[in-house]
């Protein structure tokens, strides 16, 4: 249960963290956000925030796109996050949601001459996709919004309506998740997750120029695949039909973590079950994020003093 929020420059009870119905971001989607995972390590009795600095670096880049000016550095944002999590006292996996937004209370679509603000809360959070052996995905009829319309490299609140359209279409049609194409028909990503394929032992993922989020988990997977598993990783455009001939496939992201894809458009991906390469990647990733791999321990920020 969430008890606190960072709001208007201080940590307050969650009930006090309220915005006006006239709030600009509430009316026009003029905000940006991050999702940051914190992982409970039972053996060490420690909560580790994973890759906090890269998330806040990306948040500040999103702020630049929306002309939002925050009075906080990456270091200060990280300190506030640890303080909030300590106050919450979580002894389980958690998810932190920082939001930067246009806080003026007025009517009028624009980014300039508006007040900016920042808020943050955290919630206990488990798996985003529950199926251990793999999700059932469908190629969506909704296309990813192009960079020169609403840039996907920014986590902009209003742009996630595009993700919501594809996700809900998939679920209403009996699937777990959507795969979205670009305007020219190449594979972009999931509704709100990056995507990888495995073909002939090679890991393949769309480049960041295919209107995808510049995923922090995506970059971590690429590093682990190359340096720890010795895999060849190709960042290149992916045709739709490659989805149907892939040996394995998976979604990745802070929320979804690493989630295998068992079927696409009701066609089995490989054996239709969790494949060996995805399993290796997933197992290694979860060991890293819980602070169990010494080489990557510096990416994990402890919450509780020892």
Description of each model-found segment:
Residues 93-100:
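ATP-grasp fold ATP-binding core
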Residues 1-83, 106-306:
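Helix-start/capping segments and mature chain N-termini
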Residues 103:
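Active-site loop/lid in soluble adenylation, ligation, and acyl-transfer enzymes
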């Amino acid at each position: 249960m969430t008890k606190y929020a960072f709001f208007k420059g201080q940590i307050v009870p969650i009930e006090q963290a309220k915005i006006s119905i006239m709030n600009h971001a509430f009316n026009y989607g003029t905000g940006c956000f991050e999702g940051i995972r914190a992982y409970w390590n039972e053996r060490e009795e420690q909560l580790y925030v994973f890759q906090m600095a890269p998330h806040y670096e990306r948040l500040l880049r999103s702020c630049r796109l929306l002309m939002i000016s925050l009075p906080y550095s990456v270091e200060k944002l990280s300190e506030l996050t640890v303080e909030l999590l300590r106050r919450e006292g979580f002894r389980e996996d958690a998810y932190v949601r920082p939001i930067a937004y246009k806080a003026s209370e007025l009517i009028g679509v624009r980014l300039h001459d508006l007040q900016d603000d920042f808020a943050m809360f955290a919630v206990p959070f488990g798996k985003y996709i529950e199926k251990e052996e793999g999700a059932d995905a469908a190629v969506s009829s909704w296309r990813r919004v192009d960079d020169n319309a609403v840039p996907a490299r920014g986590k902009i609140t209003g742009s996630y309506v595009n993700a919501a359209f594809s996700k809900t279409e998939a679920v209403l049609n009996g699937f777990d998740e959507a795969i979205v194409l670009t305007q020219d028909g190449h594979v972009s990503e999931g509704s709100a997750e990056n995507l990888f394929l495995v073909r002939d032992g090679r890991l393949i993922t769309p480049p960041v120029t295919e209107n995808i989020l510049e995923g922090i988990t995506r970059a971590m997977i690429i590093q682990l695949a190359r340096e720890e598993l010795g895999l060849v990783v190709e960042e290149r455009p992916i045709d739709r039909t490659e989805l149907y001939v892939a040996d394995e496939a998976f979604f990745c992201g802070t929320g979804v973590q690493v989630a295998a894809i068992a079927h696409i458009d009701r066609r089995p991906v490989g054996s239709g079950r969790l494949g060996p390469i995805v399993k290796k990647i997933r197992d290694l990733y979860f060991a890293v994020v819980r602070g169990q791999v010494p080489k990557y321990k510096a990416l994990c920020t402890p919450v509780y003093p020892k």
